[in-house]
Amino acid sequence: MLSRAVCGTGRQLAPALGYLGSRQKHSLPDLPYDYGALEPHINAQIMQLHHSKHHAAYVNNLNVTEEKYQEALAKGDVTAQIALQPALKFNGGGHINHSIFWTNLSPNGGGEPKGELLEAIKRDFGSFEKFKEKLTAASVGVQGSGWGWLGFNKERGQLQIAACPNQDPLQGTTGLIPLLGIDVWEHAYYLQYKNVRPDYLKAIWNVINWENVTERYMACKK
C-alpha cells in the first residue's frame, strides 16, 4: 500500500524501488471525488481512463516487477536486479506521482492558497501570479511526457519549481519534497484539449486543491 504520509513520499515508497522480504502489494487508491467532479475543467472520460486504466497499470506493473525483483534477489542474480531497475523506477514513480496528483485536485479547488503557503510563495517567487506563470511554463515546456512540480527544499527551507521527465519521481530525482504535481502526459488532457497543452494548464488551476498542498507544506516544515 502506498503510504498516506504527505511528507517524504519518496522515502515512504523507497522500499518499493529496491528491497526485499515480505511486503503488501500496492493497490490503486480511491479518488476522493467522482470522475465527473472536475468538469468542465477535466472531463469524466479523461478522469476515468486516467485513474482506472493508466494509474491501475502502473500499480499492476509495479507489483509484477517487485515479484520478479524478489526472485532475482533470492537467486542472487545481480544482472536481473539491474535489468529490473528501469521498470521499478517507471512504475513506482507512476504510482507515487498519481497518488499525489489525485489529492492535489478538488472540485472545490482553485483560487489562491492562504496563510503560510501563500507567504512562502510570495517570498520565493515574488507573487502568486509569478509562481503560476513559472510553474505553467515549466509544465508546458516538458518535452514529450512528464510532470511539472512545486517542491520543498528542506535543506534551504525554500519552495522550488522543477520538471521531471516520464514518471521520474520528484523526490527520488531532485531531493525536493513534492507538494503539487501537474501531469502533462497526453493521457491527462488529450481527449479534451487535443495537442494544446497550454489550455489544459490554464484549466487545471481551477481545480487545484490548495488545502491539500498547504497540508503537505506544513507537514514538511516540521
Swiss-Prot record:
Cofactor: Mn(2+)
Alphabetical keyword list: Acetylation, Manganese, Metal-binding, Mitochondrion, Nitration, Oxidoreductase, Transit peptide, Ubl conjugation
N6-acetyllysine, modified sites: 68, 75, 114, 122, 130, 202
PANTHER family associated with the record: SUPEROXIDE DISMUTASE 2, SUPEROXIDE DISMUTASE [MN], MITOCHONDRIAL
Name of the molecule in the record: Superoxide dismutase [Mn], mitochondrial
Range annotated as the organelle transit peptide: 1-24
Reactions the enzyme catalyzes: 2 superoxide + 2 H(+) = H2O2 + O2
Compartments in which it is found: Mitochondrion matrix
Family to which the UniProt record says this protein belongs: Belongs to the iron/manganese superoxide dismutase family.
Residues that bind Mn(2+): 50, 98, 183, 187
GO annotation, biological process: cellular response to oxidative stress; regulation of transcription by RNA polymerase II; superoxide metabolic process
GO cellular component: mitochondrial matrix
Residues the record lists as 3'-nitrotyrosine modifications: 58
Gene: SOD2
Cofactor note: Binds 1 Mn(2+) ion per subunit.
